[in-house]
């Protein structure tokens, strides 16, 4: 997406967006203070074009990577709302009328580093994708009204004709077939005598990310006998390593900045694609 920024602010300080003292924005709120890894504090922006419609004058956002900690803050009266409560608590919260599920233009996926073995081979990447049971992961781990994804662009955005859903018009691009996946691995030269190299899944700290990684770890080991290891990192370190390509498999997600398929597809032509791939 594109948002206007103050030219002088950007030119005078390349890190202008990293601290409350230097950040400049034009939304309904101003960032009053920012305690990194602690809390964000906002006040109403009286210069906002629609300020009369902004009812809440202040907002405080506690920061925590832990879903359980965020839920404790809400249930303890220290916060009013949160996103993504722990899966184990979702049914209880829904029955109590506290969990509200709404549509979101987003996806959750795993990146294969196309420059790291064994994922330099597209057939290996395809095979590893083909054995993942997305429906079971959504049903037993993710929950919360999510849907399994069989293509990169989610439902909810229009085709170029302005009437059809882009995802429905494009059909599925991914399918599950364990036996075919095993054949692809054999064709790639891997078997009992030439096993796959150890594989590490990189993810940032979260109960849900961990549970998904464990499920996929078990799936890949069962299907291919792969030695799959898990590595979690604090978000800042995780993002830096993922961007630098210091991983084999890494979790990722994307929420649309605007409602057009281009917002998802443009990543494939970007030279800074985190999977180290870009289309000419």
Stretches with model-predicted labels:
Residues 1-53, 58, 183:
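Gly/Pro-rich hinge or "lid" segments in bacterial periplasmic/extracellular proteins
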Residues 17-20, 46-92:
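Ligand-site clamp/hinge motif
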Residues 36, 178, 182-256:
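Ligand/substrate-recognition segments at binding pockets and active sites
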Residues 43-47, 104-127, 131, 140:
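A bilobed periplasmic-binding-protein/Venus flytrap-type ligand-binding module shared by bacterial periplasmic
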Residues 90-101, 246, 260-275:
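Ligand-binding "clamshell"
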Residues 98-113, 272-280:
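Periplasmic-binding protein-like
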Residues 138-139, 172-175, 226-243, 263-280:
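Extracytoplasmic/peripheral linker and loop segments enriched in polar/acidic and small residues
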Residues 148-187, 206-211:
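Structural transition elements
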